[in-house]
Structures are given as structure tokens and as C-alpha cells.
Amino acid sequence: GSEPLGTELGAEVSGTDLWADIKTTPIPAWELINTKKYASMNIQYSRGCPFNCEFCDITLLYGHKPRIKATQQVLAELDSLYARGWRGGVFFVDDNFIGNKGKLKNEVLPAIGQWMDQRKHPFTFSTQASIDLADDPELMRLMVQAGFNTVFVGIETPNQDSLEECSKFQNKGRDLVACVKTIQSFGLQVEGGFIVGFDSDPHSIFERQIEFIQKSGIV
């Protein structure tokens, strides 16, 4: 007909509540790149996040329910990197790696740890997680045993009103400095994400952010 190409398809796709089955995603074609030109390799275990931070597009793109790959998929991707000769950092690009804690603790992390032990720890892992990681000593211990040494955490702001404003409820009412130090105490370096410019921010927000970073020892 005379309608622009893709109009009908676009309407259908934009209204769907279906998500891709990531258990069917192929192993990345690492042979298409020169890995020697990269500081780190990326793999993905899950998509989606149970939280609803107002500024974040991830839940719109991937949904609130974390969808996860099978453990053997993750190991196969690690195998493929290892076979390509990669030795070094591997970043799990999940926006919240710990969205499904039970599966991680019971299956995925123990399997990765065993895989690493069998190959004399060829990789170091980093990822992103919500601050409630600090509430789960077993999870932090298993992450370190599996080879994780760095985690990025969205701190955003030490100002409670600003956390309320952006619906970052998982950070509200917490001693965020203590949470960071707890994560660090298990051997994980904490990198932090921060935001300034909320309507609720006081004039002192820059000084408060600097003070928080210095107190927490965050990277």
C-alpha cells in the first residue's frame, strides 16, 4: 500500500509485552574482532531489573523480571573467550547482576568458580549490582570465590529527598557508606554512579557528594 514501510510493524512491536528468550541467544562471534585491541571482554547473563528508578531506561527496554541464561550458556561463552586466547578482564554487562539471587548462589556462581579453578583463573570479573548486595554475605563471598573483584553500584545521591524524587527506593533509609564498606570488606572494589541536579538537591550537594566518596573510599 501507500503507507510508509514499517509503520504497521512498528505499531505492533511498540505495543508488545513479549521479551526475547535469552536462553536462545548465540555465543558472540569473537572471531570478528581483534581481542588484543580491547581492555576487557563483555558477556551478559541476564536482562531486566526488579527496581523502578525514574531516570533509568533499562526496565522499559528489558522489563522488571530478570530473564537469565542457562548456566551452561554462560560457561560456553567463557569457553569461547578462553579458546580465543583471551586472558584478563571480563565484564558482565547485566544492569543488575543480582536480580535473581537464588539462581546465582545455587548454580551459576559455583559453576563459574569451578570453571575458573580448573583453568587456573584466566579471567577477572566485574559487573553491576544494586546496593542490596550488601545484605547478602553468601552472595558476596561466592562472587569473590568465582573471580569477581569489582562491582559498580548506583549510589546516585546521599540526599534522601532526592532518592525519593527519583524512586530509588532500594537506597532509601540505608547507611550507604556502611553498605559500601561492607561490600568492600568481602574483597570487592566498589565503583559508584552519582547524579547531581535533582530538584530536591540542596545547595550543598556537591560538598555532600565529595564527603560521601571520601568517607566510603568508593572508586
Question: What positions do the PLM features span?
Answer:
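Glycine-rich beta-alpha loop elements in corrinoid/cobalamin-binding modules
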Residues: 1-21
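C-terminal accessory regions of radical SAM enzymes
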Residues: 5-10, 204-219
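Radical SAM [4Fe-4S] cluster-binding motif and immediate context
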Residues: 23-191, 198, 204-207, 211
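Conserved beta-strand->loop/alpha-helix structural units within folded catalytic cores of enzymes
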Residues: 188-193, 216-218
